[in-house]
């Protein structure tokens, strides 16, 4: 669904990174939006949107404040654990040791993007054009590190990020449903955009 939706909005899409609440997906697509490769994180929600939500709670920030706060960093603090269970304890220890909040957040953002990019590397790397989907694509710091790592590893490629990136999966799902309904209807039946049909 994510690949189909991304391809519908950006027809030249060949690589999709979907950064979701509970999982990350690296997808390669061919023309017509056909999926040729699919990889998803296979352990837990660490490094996904839910992890960022937990981090926001630990710092008393909203999700919308995470990215801008991380972008104030003067350095990126090395984060050893991306496990949600242990992240809170590590953050408290880093703060106790004098690390600054923006620096810790920058390190956290960089760490989760590195995990996502390793997923893309396992799937065969970035092929031009690259489309970034999911709600986390709206996080400024995540976006900064994704762009940086794509350029560092694969050179200059066209990167697509839609303002409604969070809805790409829903769009693809709706398009699949519409196509399947159309295929099941008697020949000559027209499907209205509203979802109704007329003979």
Task: Describe each PLM feature range.
Residues 4, 52-54, 160-196:
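Glycine-rich phosphate-binding/hydrolytic loop that grips phosphoryl groups
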Residues 87-119, 166:
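Adenine-nucleotide phosphate-binding core of ATP-dependent small-molecule kinases
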Residues 62-93, 186-189, 196-198:
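Internal, active-site/partner-interface "lid" segment
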Residues 9, 31-75, 175, 179:
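Glycine-rich phosphate-binding loop plus the immediately following alpha-helix
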Residues 1-2, 17-21, 39-47, 107-109, ...:
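Active-site nucleophile and cofactor-binding loops and adjacent substrate-binding regions
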Residues 20-31, 82-89, 139-154:
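Acidic-glycine-rich active-site phosphate/pyrophosphate-binding loop
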Residues 124-149, 162-166:
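Glycine-rich phosphate-binding loops at beta-strand->alpha-helix junctions
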Residues 1-20, 25-32, 37, 121-122, ...:
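Conserved phosphate-binding catalytic cores of ATP/NTP-utilizing and phosphoryl-transfer enzymes
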């Amino acid at each position: 669904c994510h690949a189909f939706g991304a391809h519908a909005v950006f027809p030249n899409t060949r690589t999709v990174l979907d950064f979701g609440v509970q999982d990350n997906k690296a997808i390669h697509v061919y023309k017509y939006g056909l999926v040729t490769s699919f990889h998803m994180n296979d352990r837990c929600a660490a490094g996904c949107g839910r992890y960022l939500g937990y981090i926001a709670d630990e710092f008393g920030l909203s999700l919308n404040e995470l990215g801008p706060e991380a972008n104030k960093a003067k350095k990126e603090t090395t984060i050893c654990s991306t496990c949600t269970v242990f992240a809170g304890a590590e953050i408290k220890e880093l703060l106790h040791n004098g690390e600054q909040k923006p620096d810790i957040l920058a390190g956290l953002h960089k760490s989760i993007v590195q995990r996502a990019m390793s997923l893309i590397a396992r799937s065969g790397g970035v092929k031009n054009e690259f489309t970034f989907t999911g709600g986390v694509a709206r996080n400024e710091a995540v976006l900064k590190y994704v762009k940086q790592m794509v350029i560092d590893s694969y050179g200059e490629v066209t990167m697509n990020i839609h303002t409604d990136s969070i809805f790409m999966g829903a769009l693809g799902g709706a398009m699949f449903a519409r196509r399947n309904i159309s295929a099941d209807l008697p020949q000559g039946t027209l499907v209205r955009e509203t979802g109704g049909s007329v003979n």
